Regions:
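Non-catalytic alpha-helical scaffolds and adjoining flexible linkers that form interface surfaces
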Residues: 1-168
Length: 168
């Protein structure tokens, strides 16, 4: 049994304050709840370092949070395939798709085959491609990415995320 008794800030980037502090709590809560202790996923810890640097050093770190959430979901195997839809067809920018946590992304016309209580989100193929490529430069892609990552994370953590509740 390992116990942390004391921690000191060793620097390297500014200590998080204000909203950055809550973002840091959120990031660490996701890591704690979605990964097993001492998981050997070095690229995930690289993503954690990158997002913490962004959160501590940038005024607007929304894109960094979305990028980290997507990296976390992808590396843990909880992200849907954004290269192909449920029919094996390539995701096309001009199409609209239905995304749910439980199923593959499908063209919106096929969404009716799912139980109406099955929560999901309609999203353009262009946004899916931007999410897949980590392109969060457009405000619309940031907003849609938030809906997508929140849907997927909430499905994995039905008990909720405490740090998110503090910010609301």
């Amino acid at each position: 049994l390992k116990t942390l008794h004391r921690a000191e800030w060793i620097g390297g980037w500014p200590q998080p304050q204000g909203r950055a502090l809550f973002s840091g709590l959120y990031i660490n809560e996701l890591m704690l709840k979605l990964t097993a202790r001492e998981d050997p996923i070095p690229e995930l810890y690289d993503a954690l370092e990158a997002v913490m640097r962004a959160v501590c050093g940038e005024n607007s770190h929304t894109a960094a949070l979305r990028r980290f959430e997507w990296a976390l979901l992808t590396r843990l195997g909880f992200a849907p395939d954004l290269f192909h839809d449920g029919n094996g067809e390539a995701i096309r920018a001009e199409e609209t798709y239905w995304l749910t946590p439980e199923n593959a992304v499908v063209p919106i016309e096929e969404a009716e085959r799912f139980n109406p209580r099955n929560h999901g989100v309609a999203v353009s193929g262009d946004i899916l491609i931007q999410l897949r490529e980590g392109d969060f430069t457009h405000p619309e892609s940031l907003g849609q990415s938030l809906k997508i990552t929140r849907l997927l994370i909430d499905n994995l953590l039905p008990e909720g995320i405490k740090s998110r509740q503090v910010l609301q």
